[in-house]
């Protein structure tokens, strides 16, 4: 059973590499544009493969159109990849938009913004303390 898992994982990795090459080099559909294959999850019986993709665009409508274009071309993409891989059965491809990368970048930007705001507040607060300490030092020297 463990051997089946490792075989499906190896097939998924090879399928990911082949799909990335086919989508970059062989697809001429302008609706798809630049696409990145993040991961491939192959079913145990090798009948289906979920292909997780991301695009350069973040607009939901454009992303949905691109996924639909990939789904429409899935049979053609499958035949191109089948010619490159030595499998008895080529899995049926299902393209899924992977929003985790976009969400991760958004969260990273939020954290960076909070850190820079916090540093600015600390610097401003530190400058105010320096001014109040220097005025206290001057008033002590006058006594």
From Swiss-Prot:
Entry's Gene Ontology cellular component terms: cytosol
InterPro entries tied to this protein: KH_dom-like_a/b, RbfA, RbfA_dom_sf, Ribosome-bd_factorA_CS
Record region (Disordered): 116-143
SUPFAM superfamilies given in the database record: Ribosome-binding factor A, RbfA
Compositionally skewed regions (Basic and acidic residues) per UniProt: 116-128
Xref: Gene3D superfamilies: 3.30.300.20
Origin superkingdom: Bacteria
Keywords per UniProt: Cytoplasm, Ribosome biogenesis
GO BP terms, alphabetized: maturation of SSU-rRNA
Pfam families in alphabetical order: RBFA
An annotated Gene Ontology molecular function: ribosomal small subunit binding
PROSITE patterns, alphabetized: RBFA
Protein family membership: Belongs to the RbfA family.
Database matches in PANTHER family: RIBOSOME-BINDING FACTOR A, CHLOROPLASTIC-RELATED
Assembly description: Monomer. Binds 30S ribosomal subunits, but not 50S ribosomal subunits or 70S ribosomes.
Primary role: One of several proteins that assist in the late maturation steps of the functional core of the 30S ribosomal subunit. Associates with free 30S ribosomal subunits (but not with 30S subunits that are part of 70S ribosomes or polysomes). Required for efficient processing of 16S rRNA. May interact with the 5'-terminal helix region of 16S rRNA.
Name the record gives this protein: Ribosome-binding factor A
Native organism: Shewanella sediminis (strain HAW-EB3)
Gene name in the database record: rbfA
């Amino acid at each position: 059973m463990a051997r089946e898992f490792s075989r499906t994982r190896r097939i998924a990795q090879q399928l990911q590499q082949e799909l990335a090459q086919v989508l970059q080099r062989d697809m001429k559909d302008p609706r798809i544009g630049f696409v990145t294959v993040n991961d491939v999850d192959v079913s145990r019986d090798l009948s289906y493969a979920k292909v997780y993709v991301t695009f350069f665009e973040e607009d939901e409508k454009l992303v949905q159109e691109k996924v639909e274009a990939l789904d429409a071309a899935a049979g053609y993409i499958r035949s191109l990849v089948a010619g490159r891989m030595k499998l008895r059965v080529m899995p049926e491809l299902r393209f899924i938009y992977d929003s985790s990368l976009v969400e991760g970048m958004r969260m990273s930007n939020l954290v960076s913004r909070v850190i820079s705001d916090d540093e600015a507040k600390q610097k401003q607060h530190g400058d105010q303390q320096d001014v109040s300490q220097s005025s206290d030092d001057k008033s002590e020297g006058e006594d």
